Amino acid sequence: MSTSREDSVYLAKLAEQAERYEEMVENMKTVASSGQELSVEERNLLSVAYKNVIGARRASWRIVSSIEQKEESKEKSEHQVELICSYRSKIETELTKISDDILSVLDSHLIPSATTGESKVFYYKMKGDYHRYLAEFSSGDAREKATNASLEAYKTASEIATTELPPTHPIRLGLALNFSVFYYEIQNSPDKACHLAKQAFDDAIAELDTLSEESYKDSTLIMQLLRDNLTLWTSDMSESGQAEDQQQQQQHQQQQPPAAAEGEAPK
C-alpha cells in the first residue's frame, strides 16, 4: 500500500524528532516529487531534511581536510596522508550524491511547479546553496561548473526577490546572507560579499518598522548574522591586506577558515 502525502509528511516530522534525517529526506522527496506545489511547512521540512544530511558531511569534510593538511606537513606520514585522502574522497562522494539528489528534485519538480515569488526565491536559493556545496570541495572543471551554476541560481533568486519580496522578508535576507558567503568563500571576492551583505542589512533596517510580528524574530536573527559576517570579513580583510586572495585560496584548498554564518528558511 502506497503512503499518502499526509502520512509522508507525518513520517518526515517523526524522523526529524528521532534525528533520522536520511529517512526524513526520503519521505520529503516522495512529497516533493508528487508534481504538486509544496506548502510552506512542506518545503521547510524538505530544506531541514537535506540541510541536516549534507551538513554532517560538510562538517566531516572540513575536519578531515584539516587533519590532512597537518599530516602533510609532517615527515614520514605519506601512508597516513594516502589513507586520509581516500577517506576524504569517500565523504566527497556522499556530498556529491546528496547534492545531485536535491538538485534533480529542484529542477524536475519544485522549480517548475512554483507559482509564488516566495517559493521561487526559496527554491532558486536552495539550488544556489547545493551547487555551492559542490564547489566547496571540487577542483578544476567540476568546480568551475558548480560555481557558475551556483552564481546563476543566486542571481535568478535575487532578481525575483528584489521585485517580489520586501527587504525585511526572511527568505530574501537568507538569500543575501548565503549569496554573500558564496562571493566570499567560493569566488574569493570579499568586496562583493561585504557590499551585498551591507546592502541587504541597510535595506532591511530602513524598512524595519514594516516588519510583521510573525517574521520579526526570523528576520532580525538573519540581520544579526549578516552583521556578524561583515564584522568577520572586514576584520580578515584588514589583517590580510594584499595577501587576501592568495590566503583565501589556500584556506579553501587546505584548511577551512571559521565558517561564515549561513541562513536557512525559518520553520
UniProtKB/Swiss-Prot annotation:
Q: Which GO terms describe its cellular component?
A: cytoplasm; cytoplasmic stress granule; nucleus; plasma membrane
Site described as NTH1 binding, located at E136, E185
Query: What GO molecular-function term can you cite, just one?
Result: enzyme activator activity
Q: Which GO terms describe its biological process?
A: aggresome assembly; ascospore formation; chitin biosynthetic process; DNA damage checkpoint signaling; mitotic spindle orientation checkpoint signaling; negative regulation of apoptotic process; negative regulation of protein ubiquitination; negative regulation of transcription by RNA polymerase II
Q: Which UniProt keywords apply?
A: Acetylation, Isopeptide bond, Phosphoprotein, Ubl conjugation
* Top-level taxonomic group: Eukaryota
Extent of Low complexity compositional bias: 243-267
Q: Which residues carry this modification: N-acetylserine?
A: S2
Covalent cross-link site, Glycyl lysine isopeptide (Lys-Gly) (interchain with G-Cter in ubiquitin): K76
Which residues are annotated with the PTM Phosphoserine?
S89
Q: Name one Pfam family in it.
A: 14-3-3
Q: Where is this region: Disordered?
A: 236-267
> Is Acetylation a UniProt keyword of this protein?
yes
- Family listed: Belongs to the 14-3-3 family.
What is said about its interaction partners and assembly? Answer: Homodimer. Interacts with NTH1 (via N-terminus when phosphorylated by PKA); the interaction is direct and activates NTH1. Interacts with FIN1.
Q: What does this protein do?
A: Involved in growth regulation.
The miscellaneous annotation reads: Present with 158000 molecules/cell in log phase SD medium.
This chain's protein is named Protein BMH1
- List the source organism: Saccharomyces cerevisiae (strain ATCC 204508 / S288c) (Baker's yeast)
